[in-house]
């Protein structure tokens, strides 16, 4: 038998409560950490993964919807700009037409047409005296003269009117004198000759123009 056990016979009884206390201290769950230790533990558990600055990728459906919305906004913007441009052009055209219709005696329209008209007139203009006084139209009918009536024909007309005799109950004028009839006949004859000359000249110019074109 061990001498230590002989000397201390109560040692087994004392050791048993100590072992029970040690087992009781080791057996239960560890106690909760203090308030100062909790932040340190939280920081130690953080992982060096991606930070919060990196955006989380959106799902494909949301990406398509956002793309459609941006596309529709851009298309609407372009459509609005195109509509405004068309509106400005239409208003400008309407104002121009209104200005042309409101111009007195169509001065504005004649001013635009006059260069082409002058060009065509210069092309078919004749240098003879009769064509300068009577400008022929394209239809072959001579136009009106720009000058005043010939004084001789006016005088003959006045003489013929002065020779008329007015009587009650008779509406037939008296005969014209022979001196007034001769200048009138010669004037009519000259006028017919001038018309014939202008017609021939116009036909010649028209034929020449058709051959050139």
Curated annotation (Swiss-Prot):
<keyword id="KW-0597">Phosphoprotein</keyword>
<feature type="compositionally biased region" description="Basic and acidic residues">
    <location>
        <begin position="186"/>
        <end position="197"/>
    </location>
</feature>
<protein>
    <recommendedName>
        <fullName>Protein FAM156A/FAM156B</fullName>
    </recommendedName>
</protein>
<dbReference type="GO" id="GO:0035064">
    <property type="term" value="F:methylated histone binding"/>
</dbReference>
<keyword id="KW-0007">Acetylation</keyword>
<dbReference type="InterPro" id="IPR029096">
    <property type="entry name" value="Dppa3"/>
</dbReference>
<dbReference type="GO" id="GO:0016020">
    <property type="term" value="C:membrane"/>
</dbReference>
<feature type="modified residue" description="Phosphoserine">
    <location>
        <position position="114"/>
    </location>
</feature>
<keyword id="KW-0472">Membrane</keyword>
<feature type="region of interest" description="Disordered">
    <location>
        <begin position="1"/>
        <end position="62"/>
    </location>
</feature>
<dbReference type="GO" id="GO:0005635">
    <property type="term" value="C:nuclear envelope"/>
</dbReference>
<feature type="compositionally biased region" description="Polar residues">
    <location>
        <begin position="8"/>
        <end position="37"/>
    </location>
</feature>
<feature type="region of interest" description="Disordered">
    <location>
        <begin position="165"/>
        <end position="198"/>
    </location>
</feature>
<keyword id="KW-1133">Transmembrane helix</keyword>
<feature type="transmembrane region" description="Helical">
    <location>
        <begin position="154"/>
        <end position="170"/>
    </location>
</feature>
<keyword id="KW-0812">Transmembrane</keyword>
<dbReference type="Pfam" id="PF15549">
    <property type="entry name" value="PGC7_Stella"/>
</dbReference>
<feature type="modified residue" description="N-acetylmethionine">
    <location>
        <position position="1"/>
    </location>
</feature>
